[in-house]
Curated annotation (Swiss-Prot):
UniProt region (Disordered), positions on chain: 40-71
Principal subcellular localization: cytoplasm
One Gene Ontology cellular component annotation held by this UniProt entry: translation release factor complex
Annotated region (G3), positions in chain: 201-204
Described function: Involved in translation termination. Stimulates the activity of erf1. Binds guanine nucleotides.
GO molecular function: GTP binding; GTPase activity; translation release factor activity
Protein's name according to its UniProt entry: Eukaryotic peptide chain release factor GTP-binding subunit
Location(s) in or outside the cell: Cytoplasm
Length: 557
């Protein structure tokens, strides 16, 4: 997913096929985190990787055009790609229908999986080790074969970044590898015996916070990666992105935060309990200010992503005598209480789309409701009617996908390239999502640009909600709000300042799919940013009489 880092013109790329995933080793059974087959040695560096030249292995894929007989279908393994096509130049409707029929046949071979699915996003300041930690998880859970890992090691050495071997698994484009900074939201999958996971590796640099918001908007759990190294922790907290990421995660609606105190094996730290306590004490104060409840919302885990320590397997005896808690993956496996609105209206914000052989595929997280193969749905806001051909996860398929699943959906019925845009949502035909350009909202002001310190009517910035990004202008201020009692204090104020909460009317540059907070919180939360900082966050409380009447009319129809 290519994203423009400039907030003023930030637009996800919706036309290119996604990059081919790294070859993955077939995984028959994934061990429990506490009994994983990979046991990290108590050393700050991973075991050396064999780099002698051998034939490179690649993941097996199956071309739709190669499926001719029932035997071809039977030979498809669950870990193979669902389908692969060579071009997207098909214009003939009959040929598109033929491809769609073959896709339907292929996905019938794949198993359904009843394990809970969690979307996790890696957050934190630049160079905290987010991509390295993500990559080490992929290796430890068997998603990267040795030949591919050896290839990444060679490439890291060629770029004089020997310590970035695991990061190369997630940072796939040349800019990320040469600069050593994540730009896009990396995406990968792994599993344990308890759960299935989608990894969203977000950028840490302040220029790419809009990209981070796209990743965090899909997540159930945030993993805030903290460098324990002397100077790096302080840089991330004092003027860095550590606290902003934690604040944004709370605003966007992430339920849990797991704080991974990374680089504990670093020579300036050496598993120091005093350093760990210093970090956790300071962060707890900041996280509470961001709205996180220390008793139930966040957990601390010490470890090392590069050293693969306390990531999958718990710490081996002798590594750290003061920590006996679960590993990072063990902590994730133990999380419970995810709220899933299965009975609600279908809502799937589209994060990516691409076209194969005339079939449009979209990727997104099911926020509410359910979606089934064969179902007719709308792409909003344009009300394009499409049919669902298939629903697939990384190694499983679904007849019906439920809230929390991050899936690829093959669709039939799209004509033209303007049906899908940033902010598009899949919705039920008889339960449409509101499309509005003016809203009433409660806004909490966090910061203001240096050149304009007051929040007043006519103030303009950038509006982020789910995958939508639009210009926004303050139309009017209705009343200031007491945040403790939620009561209105002053009617029609002329201005507001940092720290205030205000009920106001906002006008968007283009109509966006939004809902009221009482109906669907995930489609009601938003943030307001300028080019480099988060100005405010808020929630939609009223979509307006006209929008409500239109929804009522469409529902009856």
């Amino acid at each position: 997913m290519k994203l423009n880092p400039n907030a003023s013109s930030f637009v996800p790329k919706f036309v290119a096929k996604p990059a081919a995933p790294a070859p993955a080793a077939p995984v028959a059974v994934v061990a429990e985190p506490v009994a994983a087959p990979v046991v990290a040695e108590p050393t700050p560096t991973p075991a050396p990787v064999e780099t002698k030249e051998e034939p490179t292995t690649t993941a097996t894929t199956t071309s739709v055009s190669s499926i001719k007989t029932e035997e071809d279908l039977e030979n498809i393994k669950p870990t193979e790609s669902v389908y692969k096509v060579e071009d997207d130049d098909i214009e003939d409707d009959d040929e598109v229908d033929e491809v769609a029929e073959k896709i339907e046949q292929v996905v019938k071979v794949l198993p359904e999986d009843s394990r809970e699915h969690l979307n996790i996003v890696f957050l934190g300041h630049v160079d905290a080790g987010k991509s390295t930690l993500s990559g080490s998880i992929m290796v430890l859970t068997g998603q990267v074969d040795p030949h591919t890992l050896a290839k990444y090691e060679r490439e890291a050495k060629e770029n004089h970044r020997e310590g970035w071997i695991y990061a190369y698994i997630m940072d796939t484009n040349e800019e990320e590898r040469t600069k050593g900074k994540t730009v896009e939201v990396g995406r990968a999958h792994f599993e344990t015996t308890k759960k299935r996971y989608t990894i969203l590796d977000a950028p840490g640099h302040r220029l790419y916070v809009p990209n981070m918001i796209i990743g965090a908007a899909q997540a159930d759990v945030g993993i805030l990666v903290i460098s324990s190294k002397k100077g790096e922790f302080e840089a991330g907290v004092e003027g860095g992105q550590t606290i902003e990421h934690a604040r944004l995660a709370k605003m966007i609606g992430i339920k849990y935060l797991v704080v991974f105190v990374n680089k504990m094996d670093e020579p300036t730290v050496k598993w120091s309990k005093a350093r760990y306590d210093e970090i956790t004490d300071k962060l707890t104060v900041h996280l509470k200010k961001c709205g996180w409840n220390p008793k139930k919302d966040f957990h601390f885990v010490p470890g090392s992503g590069y050293g693969t320590l306390n990531v999958l397997a718990p710490l081996a005896p002798g590594v750290c005598d003061w920590y006996s808690g679960p590993s990072l993956i063990g902590t994730l496996d133990n999380l419970s209480g995810m709220e899933r609105n299965e009975g609600g209206a279908l809502r799937i914000p589209i994060t990516t789309s691409y076209k194969d052989r005339g079939i449009v595929n979209v990727i997104g997280k099911v926020e509410s409701g359910t979606i089934s193969v064969g179902q007719s749905i709308h792409i909003m806001p344009g009300k394009t009617k499409v049919e669902v051909i298939s629903l697939t996860g990384d190694i499983c398929s679904f007849k019906t996908a439920r809230p929390g699943e991050n899936i690829t959906i093959a669709l039939k019925g799209i004509e033209g390239d303007d049906s899908i845009r940033p902010g598009s949502i899949l919705a039920e035909i008889n339960r449409p999502v509101p499309v509005v350009s003016e809203i009433e909202a409660i806004v909490y002001i966090l910061d203001m640009p240096e050149e304009r310190r007051l929040f007043t009517p006519s103030f303009s910035a950038i509006f982020h909600a789910h995958t939508a990004v639009e210009d926004v202008t303050v139309k009017s201020l209705i009343a200031t709000i007491d945040t403790k009692t939620s009561t209105e204090i002053k009617q029609k104020p002329t201005f507001c300042k940092v720290g205030d909460a205000v009920k106001c009317r906002l006008v968007l540059g283009r109509a966006v799919c939004l809902e009221e907070f009482t109906t669907n919180p995930q489609l009601a939360r938003f943030t307001i940013r300028d080019s480099t900082k988060t100005i405010a966050f808020g929630k939609v409380i009223n979509i307006g009489k006209k929008a409500k009447e239109e929804i009522a009319r469409q529902t009856k129809a």
